[in-house]
């Protein structure tokens, strides 16, 4: 998976990689040539007292060193550019794919693990790419070239290489095989600690209200300890790599000096050749060490690549059709459900069964029912946040699955049950409601705020009023009104309010509804509500109970003909005042 991921996202940087490899090749060859020049200086210059030879070879050595340094600097620069571009592209690919996920895929992975995979996991692979860019050509050429040059200097001592290099390779392979499962567990534990942190931060009010700080502290401590223990185990194995490598290099160097000294003493070898052989021996083992350091990063990067590939290979449940359809004259807003049935993945029974209804332009359809009856799920089907299991949802006679999702959603102004606001300003949040090509003016923003009765509390700082993440610096009612204003900005063909007035007082609720009726024109309005006062004003009321429609009509007819609705109205003590029925 790692190789496939690298091959896919490194393709745009092939020219940079080719230039990088060329510079590394020149730099490595220059490094391999230096010990030979050094040996000639010792044997032909120093040993014979030939100053001219020393100066001449010294100048050559200086020139080769300068070339090696320049090429190395260029290779590092190109490697950094390649790594940074690769990381940027991979993060973008993750983001672009994740935003296509429906609620089903998002719930399957969970927000904490998606955040970890998009940031920490990408960073681990980026680190591998940057290290690989450094040793991509250097390590193998230095190793092979070093062996060739060492044999050229003194073939009789090459048996030391045949012993030390395999020992080093086998030892490091043994260590890495133990590190791989530990890194896989670490990434899972990082997801867990992010999940705990996110729960605590999101539910800080609940934690304090129920004085559960101690419990949350213990839960975080458990997750933190588990991650620390896994990291310690992985770190212990990783820490073995350097001592094992250092021990092998030092032991081999001692053996080389010992046997080389014996050959010099017997006149079979010159001092310069021993110095050169030592240099090549060090370069060979350094190449192995560089490869080892890369291999040390490889297990964790492999695990991260698996996790990233899992996300990227997960198809979005709500894909676009090959030949999308769209009404010739634009969306007018006729919404029809024909035998719509929906079952959540893994559930034993459907949450909605055989739902059929029609909402027409210029009318308001209220959907009422008890908690858990399936009202919000019904709205999700209309907005195509989920696809029906059976039946169909049609907008202007076209199945929503045959629309391009962006064109469908651009015709819908949704105010969800949880009125989420993005960090930034009020103006930034209102612009979210604009269409793809719509330029939202300040006048339109203030008009939308007026419709939602939100202009009063933003009057002080105006449209530049700061909004914290999630809108936590506003009350629940203020968040709902800003979310309503965001939907109004678009002037959509279909308004969908999913219990969007629950935090408003009766007076503000009535004011907002009156303003909406004025600006909605021929738009279709669908309101999910728990308030009979809201349903009473609708042109059509749909009563949902246990996933089925048990009543359709106006407020007055349902009070007389639908026991479920009558009971619902009686529980709010509104039937007598609104419907005239006791």
From Swiss-Prot:
The lineage of its organism: Bacteria, Bacillati, Actinomycetota, Actinomycetes, Mycobacteriales. InterPro entries: AAA+_ATPase, ABC1_TM_dom, ABC1_TM_sf, ABC_transporter-like_ATP-bd, ABC_transporter-like_CS, P-loop_NTPase, Type_1_exporter. Belongs to the ABC transporter superfamily. Gene3D superfamilies: ABC transporter type 1, transmembrane domain, P-loop containing nucleotide triphosphate hydrolases. The chain crosses the membrane at residues 17-37, 57-77, 131-151, 156-176, 239-259, 271-291. This is Uncharacterized ABC transporter ATP-binding protein MT1311. Keywords: ATP-binding, Cell membrane, Membrane, Nucleotide-binding, Transmembrane, Transmembrane helix, Transport. GO terms for molecular function: ABC-type oligopeptide transporter activity; ATP binding; ATP hydrolysis activity. One of its GO terms (cellular component) is plasma membrane. It comes from Mycobacterium tuberculosis (strain CDC 1551 / Oshkosh). The keyword Metal-binding does not apply. It is found in: Cell membrane. It comes from the Bacteria. ATP binds at residues 369-376. PROSITE patterns: ABC_TM1F, ABC_TRANSPORTER_1, ABC_TRANSPORTER_2. Residues 335-571 form the ABC transporter domain. Its main location: membrane.
């Amino acid at each position: 998976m790692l190789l496939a991921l690298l091959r896919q996202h490194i393709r745009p940087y092939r020219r940079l990689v080719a230039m990088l490899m060329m510079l590394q090749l020149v730099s490595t060859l220059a490094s391999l040539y230096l010990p030979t020049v050094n040996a000639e200086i010792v044997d032909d210059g120093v040993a014979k007292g030939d100053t001219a030879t020393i100066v001449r070879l010294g100048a050559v050595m200086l020139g080769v060193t300068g070339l090696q340094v320049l090429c190395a600097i260029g290779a590092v620069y190109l490697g950094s550019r390649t790594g940074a571009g690769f990381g940027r592209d991979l993060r973008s690919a993750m983001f672009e794919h994740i935003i296509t996920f429906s609620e089903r895929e998002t719930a399957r992975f969970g927000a904490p693990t998606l955040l970890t995979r998009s940031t920490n996991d990408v960073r681990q692979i980026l680190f591998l790419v940057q290290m690989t860019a450094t040793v991509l050509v250097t390590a193998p050429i230095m190793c092979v070239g070093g062996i060739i040059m060492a044999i050229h200097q003194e073939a009789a001592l090459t048996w030391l290489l045949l012993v030390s290099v395999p020992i080093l390779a086998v030892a490091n392979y043994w260590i890495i095989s133990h590190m791989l499962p530990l890194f896989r567990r670490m990434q899972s534990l990082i997801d867990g600690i992010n999940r705990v942190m996110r729960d605590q931060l999101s539910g800080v009010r609940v934690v304090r209200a129920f004085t559960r700080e101690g419990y949350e502290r213990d839960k975080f401590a458990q997750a933190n300890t588990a991650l620390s223990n896994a990291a310690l185990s992985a770190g212990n194995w990783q820490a073995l790599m350097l001592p094992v490598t250092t021990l092998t290099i030092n032991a081999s160097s001692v053996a080389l000096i010992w046997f080389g000294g014996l050959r010099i003493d017997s006149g079979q070898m010159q001092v310069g050749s021993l110095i050169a052989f030592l240099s090549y021996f060090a370069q060979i083992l350094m190449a192995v060490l560089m490869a080892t350091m890369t291999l040390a990063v490889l297990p964790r990067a492999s695990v991260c690549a698996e996790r990233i590939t899992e996300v990227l290979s997960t198809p979005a449940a709500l894909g676009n059709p090959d030949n999308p359809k769209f009404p010739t004259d634009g969306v007018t807003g006729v919404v029809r459900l024909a035998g719509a049935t929906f079952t959540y993945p893994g559930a034993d029974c459907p949450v909605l069964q055989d739902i059929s209804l029609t909402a027409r332009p210029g009318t308001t359809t209220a959907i009422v029912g008890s908690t858990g009856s399936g009202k919000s799920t019904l709205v999700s089907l209309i907005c195509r946040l989920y696809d029906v299991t059976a039946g169909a949802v049609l907008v202007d006679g076209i199945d929503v699955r045959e629309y391009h999702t962006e064109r469908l959603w651009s015709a819908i102004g949704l105010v969800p049950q949880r009125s989420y606001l993005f960090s930034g300003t009020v103006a930034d949040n209102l612009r979210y409601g604009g269409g793809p090509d719509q330029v939202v003016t300040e006048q339109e923003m203030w008009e939308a705020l007026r419709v939602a009765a939100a202009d009063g509390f933003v009057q002080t700082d105006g449209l530049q009023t700061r909004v914290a993440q999630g809108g936590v610096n506003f009350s629940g009612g203020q968040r709902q009104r800003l979310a309503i204003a965001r939907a109004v900005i678009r002037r959509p063909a279909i308004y969908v309010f999913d219990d969007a007035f629950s935090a408003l007082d009766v007076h503000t609720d009535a004011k907002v509804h009156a303003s909406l009726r004025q600006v909605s024109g021929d738009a279709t309005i669908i309101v999910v509500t728990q308030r009979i006062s809201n349903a009473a004003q609708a042109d059509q009321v749909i009563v949902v109970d246990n996933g089925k429609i048990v009543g359709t009509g106006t407020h007055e007819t349902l009070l007389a003909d639908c026991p479920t609705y009558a009971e619902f109205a009686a529980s709010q003590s509104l039937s007598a005042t609104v419907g005239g029925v006791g």
